[in-house]
Amino acid sequence: MNICGPQRYDKENNTCFNVDQLVEMAKAYNRYLSKTKLNPSRNYHFGDADLINIKSDKKYLLKQFKDRFGKICGSDEICLTHQAFMGELVGEMKDDILFGTFRSEGPSKSTEWLSTIDINQIMVPYENIYPNFKFIGAVPADCDQVSVCPLYNINYDKLMDEGINYIATIFNHDRYGQPGSHWVAMFVDINNGKLYYCDSNGKEPTKYIENSIEKFAQFYKRKTGNDIIYKYNKNSYQKDGSECGVYSCNFIIRMLSGEPFDNIVSNSLSFQEINSCRNVYFRNQPSKFKPHKLCDPTNSGK
């Protein structure tokens, strides 16, 4: 069920929702329905207009929503989140349901270049799977020099205090304000002083990206007295002009799964294999190729 966000699919119940989400959605439905009864002149469409008995039973709650919205949404759970009662949800639970439960809608064309938004929507949900991981973002090469950029004055001590051990950044070779040219990835193990850089064209980082690498090296030297362990990919395996963003996301996802850096860069995915990952990362599944198991190793087959 590839519309679900990473590790969100419940195969037994064929749903992307967890029971806590369904409980809050049922409460929101009841609040909305109660307001309707107080304002009968307003135009609402509910189907079965009975309140839902609230209990932590996933099968039961799924059936309640199917009974009420089956004619409108069928089995489309995204459709359910577009119903008016969802406006009664607030805070983190609403954000989790709307932005964390499902894969995002990606580019419609199978070889369309990934935007900053596309990349962020792929990567941010992995923070929920790995609580000690933070995705810094898809950023320009000179991000560390731009005050509105997340790498500007980045505080590694604070990240460690917050329980963050791993961070990742996807850089564009262009600087802030430029249109964008090529995506590359950086993965950092803060506690152990390890930094891995991966350009699918097999090149060293540009001087602007080197600034960010050097800042981490200086931090780790001050903190531990040791030099960082730094590796970069020397193998050129991208054979097209469209998949650099997908390669960059895939590199980080595989690093998070525990796959060794050397294995990732020496066993790279072909164009067909990396393009197939779009069918895992985006719910509209634009690629004509069957998803490769290494698109998301920890979520393979789910």
UniProtKB/Swiss-Prot annotation:
MF annotations from Gene Ontology: cysteine-type endopeptidase activity
Gene3D superfamilies assigned to the protein according to its UniProt record, in alphabetical order: Adenoviral Proteinase, Chain A
EC class name: hydrolase
Record flagged with keyword Metal-binding: no
Entry's Gene Ontology cellular component terms: virion component
Keywords: Hydrolase, Protease, Thiol protease, Virion
Catalytic residue list: H182, D199, C244 (nucleophile)
Residues annotated as transmembrane: none
EC number(s) recorded for this UniProt protein: 3.4.22.-
Organism superkingdom: Viruses
GO biological process: proteolysis; viral protein processing
Subcellular localization: Virion
Family according to the record: Belongs to the peptidase C48 family.
Stated name of the protein: Putative thiol protease R355
Taxonomic lineage from the root: Viruses, Varidnaviria, Bamfordvirae, Nucleocytoviricota, Megaviricetes
